[in-house]
């Protein structure tokens, strides 16, 4: 199925390319999830990230991060998109909210990441 969003199409192509070059299955898995219809993309609240992530960990969300709940841990969250309240709360917890494109550039091997959906 073709995507109408040029950003999402290029992100999927980049994820597949990096996965092929580095052998990182995590990026291939994220690309496969993003290729599916948007209604199946993850919508993850901060409370879920708080529950399952460890301190100073990188969390990958193949979808959107929403601002419901509190985040007290300093984590790096990489996602396709963030609600404004989620990005604010992540930064107040001394964390970092980055887009998936940046996460792929920083960690092409996909090591030490946790996918939450």
From Swiss-Prot:
GO terms for cellular component: cytosolic large ribosomal subunit. The keyword Lyase does not apply. This is Large ribosomal subunit protein eL18. Keywords: Ribonucleoprotein, Ribosomal protein. It comes from the Archaea. The lineage of its organism: Archaea, Methanobacteriati, Methanobacteriota, Stenosarchaea group, Halobacteria. Coiled coil: none annotated. Belongs to the eukaryotic ribosomal protein eL18 family. Pfam families: Ribosomal_L18 (PF17135). GO terms for biological process: translation. The keyword Ribonucleoprotein applies. One of its GO terms (molecular function) is structural constituent of ribosome. It comes from Halobacterium salinarum (strain ATCC 700922 / JCM 11081 / NRC-1).
């Amino acid at each position: 199925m073709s995507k109408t969003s040029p950003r999402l199409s290029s992100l999927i192509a980049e994820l597949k390319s990096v996965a092929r070059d580095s052998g990182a299955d995590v990026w291939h898995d994220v690309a496969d999830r993003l290729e599916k219809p948007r209604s199946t993309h993850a919508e993850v609240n901060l409370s879920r990230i708080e529950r399952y992530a460890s301190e100073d960990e990188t969390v990958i969300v193949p979808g959107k991060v929403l601002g419901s709940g509190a985040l007290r841990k300093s984590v790096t969250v990489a996602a396709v998109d963030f609600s404004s309240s989620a990005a604010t709360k992540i930064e107040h917890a001394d964390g970092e909210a980055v887009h998936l494109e940046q996460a792929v550039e920083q960690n092409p091997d996909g090591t030490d990441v946790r996918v939450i959906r």
